[in-house]
Amino acid sequence: MSVLLIPNRGKDAGLSVTRHTAALLRRQGISVLMPDEFAGDFTSRDGITFLSLDRAVGVAEQVLTIGGDGTLLRAGIFCAEHDRPVLGINLGRTGFLATCEVAELDTKLARLAAGDYTLTTRSLLEAIVPSRNWRAIAMNDVVLFGRTRIHPMDYKLICDGTFVSRYRSDGLIAATPTGSTAYSFSAGGPVLDASAPVMVLTPVCAHSVHAVPVVFGADRHITIVAEQENRDTVYACADSGPQCELAPGESLHITTSPKKLRLITFDPAEQLSAIESKLIRR
């Protein structure tokens, strides 16, 4: 069995947790791989094999991210592309996705080695702006916003070719069930069951008392049009990644991606219990 470690230098000072994790995995008889950019931080005594990220994820059977939810988010799309399950070791604040705490490493890595875990499947969104030849995959959300983010813009929402509503708001968020606990939640959107085959569209600071979040089935094709009334450019981004401009009249198309992300979990009820412990009591 082989595991790829993807650490976040900004979260793991001196890569101490990464080094400890590698030692625990090797003690369980698991081969440890890491991207070759980290080769200079270790010695041959650490027993780690360094490869390019593409080669490493092709060889590894599982991926462990070491950082926080953001670290897992950035690695998640890459892992989904290669159909590799992921476990997040949490060094961040929330740990809603990265559910393994450092204090639990001994126990949970032993369970990982023994195959005592389950895999949960998370849906992804695919966003396309045809007029710009732009395509992105999102694990959390696809967000539309104006240049300054504080001035309202006008959007038209269409589902499967049928007009649904118009929004005048600072932005619009299309979120997966996973992303429903992130930006969409902060904007007043509902928390969705992670296994539900749905997506939610949530307006940000809408200039209407009637503008509410709308939940769509995962098989729907959502089109959002930057209205001609807009005097400025609208921007789209997926999971806070590279942005795409939309001039007035241009459209963003959102569907559920055929690719899925598999998360390693040791408790199938983790997401439900985290609502209380990490969202409400935080």
Describe these PLM feature segments.
Residues 93-170:
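Catalytic core of DAGKc-family lipid kinases
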Residues 10, 69-71, 94, 178-180:
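Short glycine-rich anion-binding loops that position phosphate/pyrophosphate groups of nucleotides
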Residues 152, 162, 166-210:
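Gly/Ser/Thr-rich active-site loops/lids in small-molecule metabolic enzymes
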